[in-house]
């Protein structure tokens, strides 16, 4: 008889264990000449949400500065009502064709604003290339902060953390610039309109405070292997029904079929809100839930902005690098030989198929009624 793979548990202490260098390369908060700052952060939803903790520390370090954010169009709505930023602007740098036109537009936007400090929280090949062009044009500020020890950055940490969680990599960037670390959870600013609309949605389905659990059961269309599977989630519904709970499904267009498959198995106990919420309504709903079960997906990071206990199921992705922030978040992963493969396709999907609802249940946070 083949032994079962061990189910591994990951908390913040497991995922954020890299030793950070507290050496200050340049103490930027003490520089009175810094009046206007640009933060660059593109990436996926999860990466964006994690970076909001870093953005908060930047805001706290420069309380009088004018702060701008450059992000991707898909995430602009997360910051529309964010009082930390005087300006949030986007250029679609992913468009094909028209890429070079977008690059020229981006360079012109940055040059026109005459920033005193630019903080590159993206620090990938594309952002480095654009900042290099900006410097060669003579339009870059003297203060360019990034986590890569190469041109074009004028300030960067002395050590690299290639295997660390993205949150710690960004923290290290702040430390070398003398920016204190004070924020350790996502920091989103939700407008009253989103709170009200989410409340109306819950009331319309008679969903009371702490009377339901949330399943974040999908993923981006390109990350199908990160899904635990509709059958597993449908089977898990019964566990919560026995405790007098209803189940709410949240997700976007890429997750419609997954949510329909689950809801069709339990029409009396599942409320399918997939595709019916804005991004900022997700944490509002999750804050009202008794518990959350999620895949490694961007919406799990939105949910981590709340205090609701959440279990995140990982398989092909490394929980040490993708776990959402928060002591209330537990990441689980079967210790199979092929874990952390990051494959987009898989013929056996052992990391998810072998993790049955029966094995998962003992690790779930017990939902408490209001």
How should each PLM-predicted stretch be described?
Residues 1-370:
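Catalytic machinery of carbohydrate-active enzymes
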């Amino acid at each position: 008889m083949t032994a079962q793979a061990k189910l591994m548990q990951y908390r913040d202490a497991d995922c954020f264990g890299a030793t950070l260098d507290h050496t200050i390369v340049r103490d930027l908060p003490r520089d009175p000449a810094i009046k206007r700052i640009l933060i660059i952060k593109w990436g996926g939803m999860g990466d964006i949400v994690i970076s909001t903790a870093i953005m908060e520390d930047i805001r706290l370090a420069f309380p009088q500065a004018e702060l701008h954010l450059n992000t991707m169009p898909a995430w602009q709505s997360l910051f529309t009502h964010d009082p930390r930023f005087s300006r949030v602007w986007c250029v679609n740098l992913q468009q094909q064709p028209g890429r070079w036109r977008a690059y020229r537009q981006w360079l012109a936007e940055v040059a026109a604003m005459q920033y005193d400090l630019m903080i590159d929280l993206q620090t990938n090949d594309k952002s480095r290339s654009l900042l290099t062009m900006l410097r060669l044009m003579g339009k870059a500020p003297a203060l360019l902060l990034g986590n890569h020890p190469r041109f074009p950055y004028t300030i960067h940490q002395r050590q690299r953390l290639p295997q660390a969680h993205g949150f710690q990599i960004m923290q290290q960037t702040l430390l070398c610039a003398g920016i204190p670390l004070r924020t350790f959870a996502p920091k989103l600013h939700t407008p009253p309109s989103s709170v009200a609309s989410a409340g109306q949605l819950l009331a319309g389905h008679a969903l009371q405070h702490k009377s339901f659990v949330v399943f974040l059961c999908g993923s981006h269309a390109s990350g199908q292997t990160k899904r635990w599977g509709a059958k597993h989630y449908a089977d898990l519904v019964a566990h919560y029904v026995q405790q007098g709970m209803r189940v709410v499904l949240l997700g976007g267009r890429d997750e419609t079929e997954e949510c329909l498959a689950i809801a069709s198995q339990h029409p009396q106990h599942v409320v399918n809100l997939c595709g019916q919420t804005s991004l900022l309504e997700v944490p509002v709903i999750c804050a009202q839930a008794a518990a959350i079960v999620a895949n490694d997906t961007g919406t799990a990071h939105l949910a981590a902005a709340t205090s609701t206990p959440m279990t995140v199921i990982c398989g092909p992705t490394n929980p040490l690098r993708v776990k959402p922030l928060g002591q209330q978040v537990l990441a689980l992963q079967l210790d199979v030989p092929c874990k952390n493969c990051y494959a987009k396709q898989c013929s056996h999907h052992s990391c998810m198929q072998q993790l049955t609802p029966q094995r998962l249940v003992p690790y779930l946070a017990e939902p408490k009624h209001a």
